[in-house]
């Protein structure tokens, strides 16, 4: 018999995956336009189930799907969907993506998966942007409460030292150049061949202002603060219940 802590961990993991699937399915069922032509599919563990649900649609060959990175490209292909590119289809009917954190005003922190620029590009091109997550990603108030790893910021590689200093001057408690971990020696390199910085500003009461201040720094490509972009967020909990938050 497995030790108690192992069995509990597996039960928790199973419950969380069930929550993600329920939220993803409801988000697609409630929002997918019947005559959509271009659909954005983001990155992350919850979006796996979004792509799964979209792949079950009877008219799935009537639209193209735009990816936000390598993972979502594979999800599109694996679910028998038609892959397109944002260069070909700059106007997106609807986009689905996950989030690292969602505040009470439906602002987001994204970028934990290192795809923030492409994710923001697709989301900003969409007529409707839908967020799907489990309840762990829901902040009780501001951003920076549930997600404690900092704001992901994509930067041009040779600017990271200068940007690091300037982020500290803006009030960041810590600024870390994200590393590749055991699979890669050295920093994470994005799909755009840039570096990622994680800057911890603590609780963020005005994400719009912080985003603008960071974007003004020379070398910053994009921030993981998604402000006033999401239309609706769906959160699944381990019981299978799905809650909805709209702007």
Swiss-Prot record:
Annotated GO biological process: D-ribose metabolic process; pentose-phosphate shunt, non-oxidative branch; pyridoxine biosynthetic process
Keyword Phosphoprotein: no
Record-linked NCBIfam families: PRK00702.1, rpiA
Gene3D superfamilies: 3.30.70.260, 3.40.50.1360
GO-annotated molecular function: ribose-5-phosphate isomerase activity
Organism listed in the record: Meyerozyma guilliermondii (strain ATCC 6260 / CBS 566 / DSM 6381 / JCM 1539 / NBRC 10279 / NRRL Y-324)
Compartments where found: Cytoplasm
Family, per entry: Belongs to the ribose 5-phosphate isomerase family.
Pathway: Carbohydrate degradation; pentose phosphate pathway; D-ribose 5-phosphate from D-ribulose 5-phosphate (non-oxidative stage): step 1/1
Name of the protein in its database record: Ribose-5-phosphate isomerase
Enzyme category, top tier: isomerase
EC identifiers of the protein: 5.3.1.6
């Amino acid at each position: 018999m497995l030790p108690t802590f192992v069995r509990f961990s597996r039960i928790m993991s199973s419950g969380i995956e069930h929550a993600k699937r329920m939220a993803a399915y409801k988000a697609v069922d409630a929002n997918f336009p019947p005559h959509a032509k271009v659909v954005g599919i983001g990155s992350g563990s919850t979006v796996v189930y979004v792509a799964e649900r979209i792949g079950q649609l009877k008219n799935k060959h009537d639209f193209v799907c735009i990816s936000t990175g390598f993972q979502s490209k594979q999800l599109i292909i694996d679910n028998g969907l038609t892959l397109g590119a944002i260069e070909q289809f700059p106007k997106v009917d609807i986009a689905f993506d996950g989030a690292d954190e969602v505040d009470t005003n439906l602002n987001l922190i994204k970028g934990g998966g290192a795809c923030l620029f492409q994710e923001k590009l697709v989301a900003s091109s969409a007529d409707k942007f839908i967020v799907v997550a489990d309840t762990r990603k829901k902040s009780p108030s501001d951003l920076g409460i549930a997600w404690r790893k900092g704001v992901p910021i994509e930067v041009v590689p040779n600017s990271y030292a200068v940007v690091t200093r300037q982020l500290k001057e803006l009030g960041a408690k810590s600024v870390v150049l994200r590393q590749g971990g055991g699979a890669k020696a050295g920093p994470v390199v994005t799909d755009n061949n840039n570096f990622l910085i994680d800057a911890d500003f603590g609780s963020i009461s005005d994400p719009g202002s912080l985003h603008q201040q960071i974007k003004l720094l020379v070398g910053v490509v994009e921030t993981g603060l998604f402000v006033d972009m999401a239309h609706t967020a769906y959160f699944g909990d381990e019981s299978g219940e799905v809650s909805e938050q709209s702007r």
